[in-house]
Design a protein with these regions (language model features):
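Helical subdomain adjoining the active site within ATP-dependent kinase catalytic cores
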Residues: 259-297
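A conserved alpha-helical element in kinase catalytic cores
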Residues: 44-90, 97-123
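A glycine-centered beta->alpha junction motif in the catalytic cores
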Residues: 91-106, 125, 144-150, 254-271
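ATP-binding glycine-rich phosphate-binding loop
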Residues: 17-40
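An alpha-helical support segment within catalytic cores of ATP-dependent transferases
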Residues: 3-22, 109, 125-181, 190-193, ...
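Active-site activation/catalytic loop segments of kinase-like enzymes and analogous catalytic loops
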Residues: 213-241, 253-270, 281
Length: 297
């Protein structure tokens, strides 16, 4: 274990003079800061981290201050302290283990996904009254062009052509919600004793359509090839995706797949590369494209 950053020591010391750093939890890739586990004097268990940038810090603090309450009592960590200048946060721990590290019996796994759908439905209502500027087709076209220039060299030509085709038109304009931004099993804590799911890591939470990341990532990384979990998740969410949402998910997923592939290769995040490949494979199957032929570093 390396030394916890001094900025995090200062943040914890703003809460208590007596504490113990018990573990460092590295995150995938070569630029994401570690998460630090800290024990307080009264048996408290906290996690602290230094955000990689001010936007991530602002998003996570906003989510804890305004949105996570919609999940219900005990369904997410609580913000203990934060410092904007040092981009540090300290949050309470929640019971359970990350779902992506567990191998649950099929019925338990379906229950977990149903609860994940229910919690996401609640979270998507948290900012119902907050305004959000609508994206324009011009900004979408610019985003697509920038991404293609930056990432096309890492994917086979047939995948690049597929992404161009899927992103040719801007996604349907959908209602904005408070999205989690990385709503995947790695951020779902499953307590086997309680048979209860909780949600962590809100640094990518922002006002976007539900299809932008929350639905598109889950759909094309997992649910496309797990119809049982797809049914359980949407039962918990309360409804299936509309045709417009499905269309938007496809367009967003196409760009996200290339972006994730590029980021994973550049930052040695093999898990993210694998997830990007899965997204491309599922998009190919959905659009009738040819079998994946490999990626280029």
């Amino acid at each position: 274990m390396t030394d916890m950053p001094s900025a995090l020591h200062h943040l914890v010391e703003s809460v208590t003079d007596t504490y113990a750093v018990v573990a460092e939890h590295p995150r995938p890739g070569d630029i994401r800061p570690s998460v630090w586990e800290v024990n307080g004097p009264g048996g408290e268990r906290w996690f602290g981290k230094v955000h990689a940038g001010p936007m991530l810090h602002r998003r996570e603090v906003t989510a804890y201050q305004n949105w996570t309450v919609a999940l219900g009592p005990g369904s997410a960590p609580e913000l203990v302290s934060a410092d904007t200048q040092t981009r540090t946060v300290l949050v309470t721990a929640v019971p359970g283990r990350s779902l992506d590290t567990l191998r649950l019996p099929a019925e338990q796994e379906r229950v977990a996904y149903e609860q994940a759908g229910e919690l996401l439905a609640r979270f998507h209502t948290a900012a119902a009254d907050e305004p959000m500027p609508e994206a324009t087709e011009e900004s979408w076209d610019e985003e697509v062009a920038r991404l293609m220039d930056r990432t096309a060299g890492h994917a086979p030509e047939h995948d690049v052509a597929m992404v161009r085709m899927l992103a040719k038109e801007a996604p349907p304009r959908l209602p904005q919600v408070s999205q989690h931004g990385d709503y995947m099993p790695k951020n779902w804590m499953w307590d086997e004793t309680e048979q209860r799911l909780r949600v962590i890591d809100f640094e990518r939470a922002e006002l976007r359509s539900a299809a932008y990341r929350d639905m598109s990532r889950l759909r094309y990384r997992i649910l496309c090839h797990r119809p049982d979990l797809d049914a359980a998740f949407h039962h918990g969410y309360g409804r299936p995706l509309t045709e417009e949402e499905q269309s938007a998910c496809q367009a967003y997923a196409a760009l996200d797949a290339l972006d994730s592939l590029d980021w994973g290769i550049k930052h040695r995040d093999i898990g993210l590369v694998d997830e990007a490949q899965t997204m491309l494979e599922n998009l190919r199957r959905e659009t009738g494209r040819s079998v994946w032929g490999g990626w280029r570093a």
